């Protein structure tokens, strides 16, 4: 038999059809309830009880799971972090006024990229919603942080899209169907949403982006369309989109960000032990996010770098002013995100109180900066002089009570004296409550019942309670309403009249106060741009102060940054390890100039080669964000990109071996690097046979030297590379102190090569059994002797080249032109591995190789 759904479930079903791909949180009284498959998913994700409601139209029980409305943010955070899209359906009319079922509507659809609630956001990180569009080998990328209003765009070659996404780490990425990128999950949108139709409705947010980059403009339009789909009603706080150019910033790809542990460590993915953690001495959320943006995009502008350095240098000198400003900044609320919530209509009374409290300090901060002279700090001070915000503080002082409740509907939000109409209603309400409060005393006197009490509950309203022993003294005008085990409850006609006036006044007061609050919030929203400008200035000021504190804590110096190609470091230290080791880190020097720009670095495992390379890269990044650096002297020519090939890592999901991953990363470096780049290579070629690896390492070194000419540090155990005799290539090694069978790593980089790796010593330190160690030492002597013989043979077969260096492969004096032509015309992707092997054997036979055999099958 068909079971008819209840009106509530019919309403739920209609609303659920509007968002079939989202979990629907359906407000019912004091709970948000989920039904059906949504309930099963919600119960499993949140680990809450799964129950059931009435039967569906097929007679099956409907699964039900609910959460308390006051705990929404906590549970919403867990659902969104688990990757779910969540639709919030609210009761949009007062149940008391409803005729029939309460009207409900979806008010928000929350996704990872559209969250604005503080509980769902990381305070010190941006939360970007990205959109990507690919065409003709180019990628248009737009990113919006809805919580702050930051809107940026970048057009890059498709092959650089992964690095660009890694740089900004968006919480959610939109793309048309068919777009895919390894390691990135896309939210597919209809291709028609990636059109410029939205541009005319964007209120000037996109500016002339459609002329500068149609791809980015269409991606930005997709974001704005998506906001409408997720029920975002206002875009007034979104800042005009800013196009970023790769020529303005040092490029740091995904691999470099990971290997250098800029934002997340390699151990557990947290910020512990990262460059961001060490430099982040900011005291406000705006400052921390500003620092993160500087690290994401180190500047290529000498002017920008100089201005920041000047500001830090002045703050280092001005200790008293520095501490005064720091105290004023400490405890400031997140102005950027508060004004975002105000503009979006989500801010509550507590947000406005926090805004008021923070804006009060701005004039004090500006005054404390009045004696500062550096160009950047003077500019920041001017940006803090916003008289319009003085008026806003006065408004909030007049309108808001000192300690309002969280919800604007709970009363006590608006201060007496702000709204005459509200004051009048409150006066009537107070008079009524005062009469009721005095009723108990007057009725005790009138009746002589000393235990008489006046009380209130939600069912009967106000009542007079008389204990049973005193019932004989109850006057005739008392009307019995309720009988208890030891008392009776009564009302009087006058009490009910006053109660009616009180409750009516209370309802009118609550409704009017809510309207007044909404009007106040609207007035605050009209100052959004001014608050955003002040918040940005505070973020930059806090970042300068944070970098100043980091410089003082780490005994850092101001680097010389210029347009040259030199990198000169004296007593340089790894910024993270130096802080952790508290002065125990061994400093090192580095000179890279026209005569020594390619360093071959040899030395044992665990001696510090990788650490040294990383510290050079980190110092370069610090220098180009305008920071001081850990050294006694530093001179750094602008670096356009940093490339790192460090450590072993496989990619099992894609079926790529460690060596394949290494070669892919190496290929990217060789294709993308320029003469102004910094390349750090660690153990290239170790994932294959010794001679294959050595050949690759040698060829790579030649290619970088002759073609790219980038500043390079190449750490290797292939000691043969130290024989590269080319201009600009220099040999350095990690110093070791040998005493008998034991060695001590001195962690110092010294001129000259070493021909020992001390791998067996490291094996002994690791606890490898002694008999294995002894056998390894015997074999090492044999293998090294054989290798020396092979190298001597190779040296006698050098080809006539402009290089005077070691050659490992004997070139035939002439190559068969027919074979060469056949190789040129080969299409490798169309032949099988077996066919390739047969071709290789055939070519060797035709070239007259003695060991060539016919293996055709």
From Swiss-Prot:
Top-level taxon of origin: Archaea
The entry's keywords: ATP-binding, DNA damage, DNA repair, DNA-binding, Nucleotide-binding
InterPro entries found in the cross-reference section: DNA_mismatch_repair_MutS, DNA_mismatch_repair_MutS-lik_N, DNA_mismatch_repair_MutS/MSH, DNA_mismatch_repair_MutS_C, DNA_mismatch_repair_MutS_clamp, DNA_mismatch_repair_MutS_core, DNA_mismatch_repair_MutS_N, DNA_mismatch_repair_MutS_sf
Biological function: This protein is involved in the repair of mismatches in DNA. It is possible that it carries out the mismatch recognition step. This protein has a weak ATPase activity.
NCBIfam families on file: mutS1 (TIGR01070), PRK05399.1 (NF003810)
Example GO BP: mismatch repair
GO molecular function (one): ATP-dependent DNA damage sensor activity
Family indicated by similarity: Belongs to the DNA mismatch repair MutS family.
Gene3D superfamilies for this protein: 1.10.1420.10, DNA repair protein MutS, domain I, MutS, connector domain, P-loop containing nucleotide triphosphate hydrolases
Disulfide bonds: none
Encoding gene per record: mutS
Protein name as catalogued: DNA mismatch repair protein MutS
Chain residues that bind ATP: 603-610
């Amino acid at each position: 038999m068909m079971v008819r759904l209840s009106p509530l479930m019919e309403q739920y079903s209609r609303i659920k059809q509007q968002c079939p791909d989202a979990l629907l949180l359906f407000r019912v009284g004091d709970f948000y309830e989920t039904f059906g498959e949504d309930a099963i998913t919600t119960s499993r994700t949140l680990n809450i009880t799964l129950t059931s409601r009435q039967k569906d139209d097929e007679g099956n029980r409907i699964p039900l799971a609910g959460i308390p409305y006051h705990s929404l943010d906590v549970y919403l955070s867990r659902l969104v972090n688990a990757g779910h899209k969540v639709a919030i359906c609210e009761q949009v009319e007062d149940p008391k006024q409803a005729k029939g079922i309460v009207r409900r509507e979806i008010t928000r659809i929350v996704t990872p990229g559209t969250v604005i609630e503080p509980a769902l956001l990381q305070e010190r990180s941006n939360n970007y919603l990205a959109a990507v569009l690919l065409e003709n080998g180019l990628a248009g990328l737009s990113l919006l942080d809805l919580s702050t209003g930051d809107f940026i765009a970048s057009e890059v070659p498709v092959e650089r899209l992964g690095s660009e996404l890694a740089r900004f780490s968006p919480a959610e990425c939109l793309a048309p169907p068919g777009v895919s990128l390894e390691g990135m999950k896309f939210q597919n949108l209809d291709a028609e949403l990636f059109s410029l139709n939205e541009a005319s409705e964007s209120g000037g947010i996109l500016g002339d982006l459609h002329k500068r980059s149609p791809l980015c403009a269409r991606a930005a339009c997709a974001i704005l369309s998506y906001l409408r789909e997720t029920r975002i009603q206002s875009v007034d706080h979104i800042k005009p989109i800013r196009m970023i150019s790769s020529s303005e910033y040092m490029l740091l790809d995904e691999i470099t960000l990971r290997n250098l542990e800029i934002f997340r460590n390699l151990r557990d993915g947290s910020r512990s032990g990262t460059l961001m953690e060490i430099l982040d001495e900011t005291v406000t959320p705006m400052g921390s996010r500003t620092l993160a943006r500087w690290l994401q995009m180190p500047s290529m502008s000498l002017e920008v770098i100089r201005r920041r350095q000047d500001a830090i240098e002045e703050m280092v000198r001005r200790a008293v002013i520095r501490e005064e400003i720091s105290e004023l900044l400490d405890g400031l609320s997140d102005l950027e995100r508060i004004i975002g919530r105000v503009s979006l209509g989500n801010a509550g009374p507590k947000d406005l109180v926090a805004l008021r409290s923070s804006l009060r300090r701005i004039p004090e901060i500006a005054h404390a900066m009045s004696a500062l002279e550096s160009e950047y700090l003077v500019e920041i001070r001017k940006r803090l002089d916003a008289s319009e915000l003085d008026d806003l503080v006065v408004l909030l002082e007049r309108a808001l009570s000192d300690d309002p409740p969280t919800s604007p509907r709970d009363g006590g939000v608006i201060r007496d004296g702000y709204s005459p109409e509200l004051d009048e209603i409150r006066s009537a309400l107070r008079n009524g409550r005062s009469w009721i409060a005095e009723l108990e005393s007057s009725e005790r006197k009138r009746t002589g019942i000393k235990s008489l009490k006046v009380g209130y509950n939600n069912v009967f309203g106000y009542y007079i309670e008389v204990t049973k022993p005193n019932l004989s003294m109850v006057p005739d005008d008392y009307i019995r309403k309720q009988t208890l085990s030891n008392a009776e409850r009564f009302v009087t006609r006058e009490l009910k009249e006053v109660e009616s006036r009180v409750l009516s006044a209370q309802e009118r007061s609550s409704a009017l106060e809510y309207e007044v609050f909404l009007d106040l919030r609207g007035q605050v929203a009209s100052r959004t741009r001014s608050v955003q400008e002040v918040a940005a200035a505070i973020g930059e000021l806090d970042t300068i102060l944070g970098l100043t504190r980091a410089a003082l804590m780490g005994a850092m110096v101001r680097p010389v940054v210029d347009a040259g190609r030199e990198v000169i470091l004296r007593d340089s230290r790894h910024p993270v390890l130096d802080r952790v080791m508290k002065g125990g880190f061994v400093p090192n020097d580095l000179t890279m100039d026209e005569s020594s720009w390619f360093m071959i670095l040899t030395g044992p495992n665990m001696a510090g080669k990788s650490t040294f390379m990383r510290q050079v890269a980190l110092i370069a990044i610090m220098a180009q964000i305008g920071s001081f650096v850990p050294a006694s002297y530093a001179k750094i020519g602008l670096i356009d990109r940093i490339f790192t090939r460090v450590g072993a890592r496989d990619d099992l999901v894609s079926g790529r071996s460690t060596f394949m991953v290494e070669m892919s990363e190496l290929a990217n470096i060789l294709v993308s690097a320029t003469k102004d780049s910094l390349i750090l290579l660690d153990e290239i070629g170790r994932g294959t046979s010794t001679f294959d690896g050595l050949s690759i390492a040698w060829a790579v070194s030649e290619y970088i030297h002759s073609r790219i000419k980038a500043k390079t540090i190449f750490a290797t155990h292939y000691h043969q590379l130290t024989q590269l005799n080319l201009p600009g290539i220099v040999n350095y090694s990690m110093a070791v102190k040998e005493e008998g069978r034991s060695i001590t790593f001195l962690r110092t980089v010294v001129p000259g090569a070493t021909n020992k790796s001390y791998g067996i010593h490291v094996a002994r330190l690791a606890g490898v059994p002694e008999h294995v160690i002894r056998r390894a030492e015997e074999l090492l002597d044999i293998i090294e002797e054989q290798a020396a013989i092979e190298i001597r043979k190779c040296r006698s077969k050098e080809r006539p080249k402009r290089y005077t260096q070691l050659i490992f492969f004997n070139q035939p004096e002439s190559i068969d032109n027919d074979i060469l032509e056949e190789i040129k015309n080969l299409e490798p992707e169309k032949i099988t591995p077996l066919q390739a092997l047969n071709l290789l054997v055939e070519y060797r036979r035709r070239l007259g190789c003695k060991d060539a055999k016919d293996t055709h099958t």
